[in-house]
């Protein structure tokens, strides 16, 4: 069994406070989330970050871990808990955003916990008959196109399982079809009642909480419910005007570029943005950007020379005032 340096996994110092630990975890969770990352080992890194936050995000588990860390464990090196080591117990539970399988190292430290071998996991269970199931937190990556899609998005996540005594026995994978609400924004938290862990002894199921993370788009920037797209133009298109095919979330449109258009100018396309809470769409703004050719042949340079001689234009006239 190898030692796991949870501080190193999250990339924080051992003196890091709760806020820094949570921020580091969220950054890694977004980076390696299976719905977002294309890296081959993303799932393993995601689970590793989740396990680290399960420990460091809870003061009781962190205190136990810090105590055993004093025995000189090094990340990735063989490790064995000291003789007679026994978990100090406690309700605990950093409440990592998504459940997952924990390592042998985790189990060797926290698996002997009386009453609930893995702690409360951030749930709201009570120590009485008919206990409510644990809530589950999950970050959900949403693409801009999906906010306009009327179809449901299928998600899979891990739900903790318990026995009749309320002791954690493992995890099971649950799959749901989720409708993305109109007007959803980055960081918004959505509650799905009763979709968390099952209750114990007839208790109610926990809830599933989805924290929305809008995935970056290669073409569009977001400003509220409006979209911004940069439209490259050749110098002659800006000077003479043109019809340009511009992408939107639902297909291309033909945008009219008026003669003598300026770089940086924004053209508004009404109703082609994102949905708001009322189901109305914002606007699309096409920001013009004049782009020079990378290379010019002799004939093209001759035309530029003729233009420079005939055009009575100085873009720096304001400097002479």
From Swiss-Prot:
One of its GO terms (cellular component) is cytoplasm. Residues 74-97 are annotated as: Disordered. It is found in: Cytoplasm, Nucleoid. GO terms for molecular function: bent DNA binding; unfolded protein binding. InterPro entries: DNA-bd_curved-DNA, DnaJ_C, DnaJ_domain, DnaJ_domain_CS, HSP40/DnaJ_pept-bd, J_dom_sf. Transmembrane segments: none annotated. One of its GO terms (biological process) is chaperone cofactor-dependent protein refolding. Its main location: cytoplasm. Residues 5-69 form the J domain. Residues 87-97 have a biased composition (Gly residues). It comes from the Bacteria. Signal peptide: none annotated. Keywords: Chaperone, Cytoplasm, DNA-binding. SUPFAM superfamilies: Chaperone J-domain (SSF46565), HSP40/DnaJ peptide-binding domain (SSF49493). DNA-binding protein that preferentially recognizes a curved DNA sequence. It is probably a functional analog of DnaJ; displays overlapping activities with DnaJ, but functions under different conditions, probably acting as a molecular chaperone in an adaptive response to environmental stresses other than heat shock. Lacks autonomous chaperone activity; binds native substrates and targets them for recognition by DnaK. Its activity is inhibited by the binding of CbpM. This is Curved DNA-binding protein. It comes from Pseudomonas entomophila (strain L48).
């Amino acid at each position: 069994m190898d030692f796991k340096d949870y501080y190193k996994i999250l990339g924080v110092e051992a003196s890091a406070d709760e806020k820094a630990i949570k921020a580091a975890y969220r950054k890694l969770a977004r980076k390696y989330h299976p719905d977002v990352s294309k890296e081959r080992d993303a799932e393993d890194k995601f689970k590793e970050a989740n396990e680290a936050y399960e420990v460091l995000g809870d003061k009781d588990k962190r205190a136990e871990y810090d105590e055993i860390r004093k025995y000189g464990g090094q990340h990735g090196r063989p490790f064995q808990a000291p003789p007679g080591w026994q978990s100090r117990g406690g309700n605990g539970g950093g409440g990592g955003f998504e459940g997952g399988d924990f390592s042998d190292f985790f189990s060797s430290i926290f698996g002997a916990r009386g009453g609930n071998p893995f702690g409360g996991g951030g749930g709201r269970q009570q120590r009485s008959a008919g206990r409510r199931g644990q809530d589950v937190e999950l970050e959900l990556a949403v693409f801009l196109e999906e906010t306009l899609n009327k179809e449901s998005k299928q998600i899979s996540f891990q739900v903790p399982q318990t026995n009749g005594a309320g002791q954690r026995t493992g995890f099971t994978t649950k799959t749901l079809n989720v409708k993305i609400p109109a007007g959803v924004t980055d960081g918004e938290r959505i509650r799905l009642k009763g979709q968390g862990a099952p209750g114990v002894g007839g208790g109610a199921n926990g809830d599933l909480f989805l924290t929305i993370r809008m995935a970056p788009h290669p073409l569009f920037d977001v400003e509220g419910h409006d979209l911004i797209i940069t439209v490259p133009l050749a110098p002659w298109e800006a000077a003479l005007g043109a019809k340009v095919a511009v992408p939107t979330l639902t297909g291309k449109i033909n945008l009219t570029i008026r003669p003598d258009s300026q770089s940086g100018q924004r053209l508004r396309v009404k109703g082609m943005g994102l949905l708001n809470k009322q189901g109305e769409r914002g606007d699309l703004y096409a920001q013009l950007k004049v782009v020079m050719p990378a290379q010019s042949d002799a004939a093209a340079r001759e035309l530029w020379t003729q233009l420079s001689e005939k055009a009575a234009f100085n873009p720096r006239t304001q400097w002479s005032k």
